[in-house]
Each structure stands twice: as structure tokens, then as C-alpha cells.
Amino acid sequence: MPITLGSGEHRYRVVENWAKLPDGWTLTDVASVAVDSKDRVYVFNRGAHPMIVFDRAGNFIKSWGEGLFGRAHGLHIDAHDNLYCTDDGDHTVRKCAVDGKVLLTIGIPNKPAPFMSGEPFHRCTHTALSPKGEIYVSDGYGNARVHKYTPDGKLLKSWGEPGSDPGQFNIVHNISTDADGWVYVADRENHRVQVFDGNGEYEAQWNNLHRPCALHCCGGQSPNFIIGELGPGLAVNRGAPNLGPRLTIVDSKGKRVARLGGENGPGLEAGKFLAPHGVALDSKGDIYVGEVGVTNWKTSFGDTPMPAEVGRARCLQKLEKIQ
């Protein structure tokens, strides 16, 4: 019997063993996921083949990016099926065509800005686009900043600084936008999502979250958002209930409408998560979840040996919407 998650209008069936990889291939950590206009699923991962493409049924189509990326982190796709690949290993954002051709690079590979300088980039994490095509970059691990660029990569402005007050950040981990131009920032270690206008003016914050890591706008007017939350990051509360890892669905004002998983901590079983790090939605409303279960294993499970399946394909899950 398939495992289901969620409630009401937000119920999902767990599709086990969805990704059909070529023999001998592994995904390792899946940092982020995106879906194009043809419902092809792009899986940005930290294995030997950084970008692997599947169809909706999980059949392998192709791979690219070998030798290009330092460390996969964020992935965003625009209305023209261009992919914005954020690499926190070499401190760049690359705009790529669906065949992997690099169309634009923002940042200088392997030349990070000084730590917490506010200058772009020091381990940037994700991108989002304004309705006009302007590029927002969350930055990230070595900065506490959001940068705004023209569509051709010229810096317009930046905002944010370390801290916990409105407009301050403690690991700017993900970023999203809606059709009205509002900017939503996953402020991970402050346990919140902050909302800004397109010029960085603070508007609101969403609380009652636990280490929000993935952030996806579902589109349309007054959209819902899917938030991937990490579990506890400290050994002292490892295994505590009701802290994730999980997915939370909220409305356009941040009010929770559904929660998927996370009641009893992380796990390999169907219906459980390891470390949701990237989320995408296809045209049928199905959810694809990329997880960093390899990197996060020791944080979640201590000295328990990591099963080989975690590094093969367990860090990618599909949740099929029940209509």
C-alpha cells in the first residue's frame, strides 16, 4: 500500500524508487531540482554527473555539467527553460541552456569575496527572477546578503547583514519571487522566511519554521509556497519529535495549510525525509524533493553507519499529488 502524506487538498502519494539511473551511477546529495515546460526534471547533484535529466516517469534522458561545477547548490528555471545554476563551491551563478551550454556567468570562479564583506559572492546559495527578468542571488554561507542584477548580470544593489533583526540574515539559504515581484528569502538559522519588495525593503516575516532550507513558489496569483525544513542541527536535540525534516506548505501570507512528514525525525522509510534541500513542482502538481542526506547524515544519525542506498538515489524523492 503506497504511503501518503499531507491532508485535505494537499495529499501526496510517495513514489518509491522513482529515478532510474544508468548502471553504476549515483546521485550522492541532490542539492536542488527544477522542472521545465515539458515536465523534464533537472536534478542538480554532487555526484560525478552534476546535472541529470529525467522524464516525469523517472526515465533517464541525459546528463551534463561534468567538470563544470565545483559544488552544486541551487537551481532555478525561467519561463524560457534557461537554468540558473548556483555553485557555492566556486562562488558563481551560471545561466545555462537545457543542453548545458553556459550563456552567462556571474561571479569569478574560485575567487570568493572576503568573508562577510557583503560583496558578491562568498558561497552563494540560490537564485530567483523578478517579473522583469532581474536576477536575485542569495549569498549565502560566507555572506549575509541578497544581490540584485540586471538580466545580463550587472549588479544593481545589495541588501542584508549578519544578525537576527528584520532585514538581517543568518545563512541566506534560498530565495524565491512571485508574479507581483515580492522577494522571499529563506533565513535558515533564524528559522524564518523574510519577505521584501523588489528593492529590498522589508515587508514581513514568516515564523513557526525549523531551519527553512528549500523554498518554492507554486505560481499564480496569491500563490502557495513549499518550504523544505531541515531537522535539528545539534546532537543534544537529535531525534526530537516535531522538528522535521519535513515539507510545509503555506499560503501567500505565510499561514500553514499543510505539513508533510517530520513528526518523528529523519529516516529512510517511505514517507520520511533526510534533509530537504531543494523542491520543485511539475504541471500536474507533483513535488520533487532533493535532499542532502549524505552531507547531513552525521548531523542526523551520529555514528550510525550510512547505508549505501543514501548515496545512490535515496536523496531524490517524488511525491505524486492525489487528485
Describe these PLM feature segments.
Residues 1-323:
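Eukaryotic scaffold repeat domains enriched in small/polar residues
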